[in-house]
From Swiss-Prot:
GO terms for molecular function: zinc ion binding. One of its GO terms (cellular component) is plasma membrane. Part of an energy-coupled inorganic carbon pump. Its main location: membrane. Forms a complex with DabB. The keyword Ribonucleoprotein does not apply. PANTHER family: INORGANIC CARBON TRANSPORTER SUBUNIT DABA-RELATED, UPF0753 PROTEIN AQ_863. This is Probable inorganic carbon transporter subunit DabA. It comes from Idiomarina loihiensis (strain ATCC BAA-735 / DSM 15497 / L2-TR). Keywords: Cell inner membrane, Cell membrane, Membrane, Metal-binding, Transport, Zinc. Belongs to the inorganic carbon transporter (TC 9.A.2) DabA family. Zn(2+) binds at C321, D323, H475, C490. Its cofactor is Zn(2+).
Amino acid sequence: MSTANRLATIAGQVSKAIAPQWPLSQWIAVNPFWHYRQQPVAGVAAHWRYSAGTRLLMSPDFYWQQWQQNRIDAALVTNKMVNELEQRSLLKAQLPQWRNLSRLVDKYTRRRRKMRWNDEVVLQISQTCGLFMQFPTRFQQAGKDSSLYQHWLTISRADRGIETLMDEAELTELFAQLPDDPHKLIQVCHDNFLSDASDYALRCYSQALISDLWGWAAAFSYQDARQDSQWVFELLCIRLAWEYILWQLAERTNTKVYQQLQQALSAQVENCEGQVAHIEQHNSLLWQWQAAYERSQLNRLQFKSDTVEESNAPDVQAVFCIDVRSERYRRALEQAGKSLGSYVQSKGFAGFFGVPLAIQRKGRDVPHVPGLLQPAYYIKAPARKQSVGSLLSNMFNAPVSMFSGVEALGLSKLKSLLTGVPGQLATANNAYIADGSICEHNGEASMESLVGICQQALAGMQFTRFARHIVLVGHGSHHSNNAQRAGLNCGACGGQTGALSARVLVRLLNNQNIREHLREQGVAIPDATQFHSAMHETVTDKVIWLSNTVPDSVKQVFRAATEKLTQACGESEKDRKTRSGHWAELRPEWGLADNNVLFFGQADRLTSADTIGSNFLHDYNSINDPDGELLAQLMSAPGLVANWINWQYYCSVTEPKQLGSGNKLLHNRVANDIGVFEGNGGDLRQGLAWQSVHNGSDFVHRPMRLQVIVEADEATIQRALAKAVAFNELFEQQWINLHRLNARGELCPVTTPVTAK
């Protein structure tokens, strides 16, 4: 295969390996390195550290600080590790990094009072991408799909401002001479400056180029997966085209710089593999400290020995859609029940209560399922007039529109605008939809299908007995003027709350005909048992009732839990509500910050109080799962979702410049909410705002890989791993850590990963 073809192939591979970023309104947390899960995390970290400067480890200073503050157990480190880390923290050694031609030109030229080339390249491409997504039909050719490369080329050839801004008279001619086809561009670049590059060097270069526009690449990856396009590949070609322009510009105008570029590029091509190996060896010490740090935090968890299950039936059972914030509420609810003389049992269950729904609205489906799944059923949403509140919300969600909104409404409205838009609490939405007919794509769902939904949901919840009252509790959050607010509803829910799913499943489970069919299948729900739906509003910890028949005795327990949490946080419910509705609030809530543990087991075995709010708790009883089938399903669904959430937070801490979204104060929505700029330029940002992981003085999210704990024997875990291919890849390559909880309450390593077939 020729070098040019190899470059095209490798550029295509690098493009396809970019993880998607969902639009703001459909937010789903994503592991940016999801497509690298089959490779060891240490190797991927070293490769991206060299190619793009991306950090998947904290600095030596961080680990040294944790050690000095006794946050890392002495038993987990050696004297050699301590001495080497101290030297690292003092020396501040710089690691080698690939430099694109734009950065090399900036290094070798003196551009006093002029914009740096790399900054202009990123800005120009980014602004062009924004126009492309905002007005796609303007750039379509007759009878053809939109071409990002053609769109950029058309704008660049017509824009004389770049030539003036950069004070380079050759640019117009150079743009005019660029090939019209991205594959031909690759051929030209190969012939001019990449003919001697190895596959390894081409991969490093491609990753370095795409990392300059990683946010846009992630957004286009989402689009490419849903349509027949190659926008990520075209974006990489656009970035490569700028490299070719700067190469030619140096050749025409500055012989010295041109020779320096040749020498520097040649050295990088020749040495890149050795440089990556050097970084991996250098990082090995930090990976040891990272492992010690993670284990030290994990050691704070305390588990009690396996005990006999409570013999009395619960008075109330509350099934929460799993979330680190619901863990706090579950503990408070069970304690409130005890204080009121009521036995309350809480459970954790992922995935919108197992109801794979979509709402059909205005000709399109709005999924109410985790991002990794597809809806199997849908409910048609009836037409509804838009409320004043939603109109105002739309007005003020538009970029830079708050000022025009104040002008239109008058200064008398400024106070109300700064405390939020009037209207229904977002978490109580979709009430009018839940009673609609549940349909499959060939018509209304059959009784058999509806029974199947209920049967699967109940099997996942693993009820051994039914309380008189069972509450399905979804979660959501409400705050204003936050571009990333959908991500705080849930890290995996596409911007949706659990309200609709809870309502629909409760409706089905209370249906007598469905119960009769369930009884025939061996699932006997007592006649006295009633299901209710509710919503945990995570900012105020208030529970919003979605059912109309909830007894006061049940509501009383939930009120007591909310009061308990309000007292514990030292902030009144009113103050929290005010904070969440304030337009200038940078930290309306912490979302899923500090998530670090996923526990499949009996939640009451976890006894440590100081770790509450960091754990995803999903009920699981291995006694009822001898072949590991259910555990494999849990690993393959909530297990992967938790990895995505955890790695988005992790990367927002370790690499906030590339994989975080910067300062929330400066967020500006872009192109129909495809993402945000920080200010008015640079790359589209991805990941979380700095204010979502840092409180101004310290991190509120500890940078830990997900610690998965399973309450099961080794054989059951191995059987599940053999079926959960992607989860097993994450485990084998150390993207997650896996532990087994034994009957004595001890955490044991799962020592024998199976190779997925």
